[in-house]
Amino acid sequence: MKSFCVKAPAKINLFLHVVDKKETGYHLIEGLFVFANLSNFLEIKVGEKDSRYDNSTVEFINSESKINNQYNTVMKAVNLLLRHAPVRTKVTVKVVKNIPIAAGLGSGSSDAGAVVRTLGKLWEIDRTILNEIALNVGADVPASVDSKPVFVRGIGEELCHIKKFSLPTNVVLVKPKKRFLSTPEVFSKHEGKFSEPIKWSDDAEKDLLKFLKETRNDLQEIAISFVPEIKDVISTLKSQEGSILSRMSGSGVSCFGIFDSEENAKAAAVNIGKKQPEWWVCNTQLIV
């Protein structure tokens, strides 16, 4: 038996534009995805040769709400990967959840990305096949396989990795406790005008802050209509000393604030935690 202990970092959408909608119902997006030190931890065990693959299991620990052990992103990734395994085997995965679920931080997508990355390397599966598997599991999973800053297009399959990350890496994440949002439900309410596609270039990387201030999260107002408290979270982050950019991540409900220094980020997290005990607050660093 082989055993691996891996991290699945939280995903943050620094911006998210909805640019079109396919006949299949999928929305086409553009966004800048980054990943944080805040992580779930996965213990992946691969059984001996000729183990029964249908005995593969997933167990979740420390999740703030119950996750179906049979129908989830990790099990879906495992089942798809097993089709390309060089030997008949089984996989067991134990996931320690530190990233809130259904909160716009890619908790499930990052778990699946870590599984695709780990088993893909172990079984030497071609990267093209891995990308197809990742997209089959979920739109955010392809970006989560490498967990590096990336500009994303399409439904999540077009990736342009950031060569130079010109932003401070000090981040505070905030989420109202016991509030969750369904990504499909939030997207289904997007009925407004689509955003114009962005012409991404190396120039945008030179001053990411300037670039980001000209962007937004097209799902933010929709999410606020479901959870009005999101508006308070964003304004609270903006009001903290050293805050340079604050908005909602993904389809919500979590929000992020980027700060000019580690000291100001730590102070903001402490301050918000004291004033808003009903909010989950996390001071972390971006992975660049």
From Swiss-Prot:
InterPro entries: GHMP_kinase_C_dom, GHMP_kinase_C_sf, GHMP_kinase_N_dom, IspE, Ribosomal_Su5_D2-typ_SF, Ribsml_uS5_D2-typ_fold_subgr
Catalysed conversion reaction: 4-CDP-2-C-methyl-D-erythritol + ATP = 4-CDP-2-C-methyl-D-erythritol 2-phosphate + ADP + H(+)
Superkingdom, taxonomy of origin: Bacteria
Annotated TM spans: none
GO biological process: isopentenyl diphosphate biosynthetic process, methylerythritol 4-phosphate pathway; terpenoid biosynthetic process
The EC number(s) this enzyme carries: 2.7.1.148
Pathway(s) it belongs to: Isoprenoid biosynthesis; isopentenyl diphosphate biosynthesis via DXP pathway; isopentenyl diphosphate from 1-deoxy-D-xylulose 5-phosphate: step 3/6
Keywords: ATP-binding, Isoprene biosynthesis, Kinase, Nucleotide-binding, Transferase
Pfam family, one: GHMP_kinases_C
Any one GO MF annotation of this record: ATP binding
Residues annotated as the enzyme's active site: K11, D140
Residues annotated to bind ATP: P100, I101, A102, A103, G104, L105, G106, S107, G108, S109, S110
Signal peptide: none
Job of this protein: Catalyzes the phosphorylation of the position 2 hydroxy group of 4-diphosphocytidyl-2C-methyl-D-erythritol.
Family label: Belongs to the GHMP kinase family. IspE subfamily.
The protein's name: 4-diphosphocytidyl-2-C-methyl-D-erythritol kinase
Organism: Wolbachia pipientis wMel
Gene: ispE
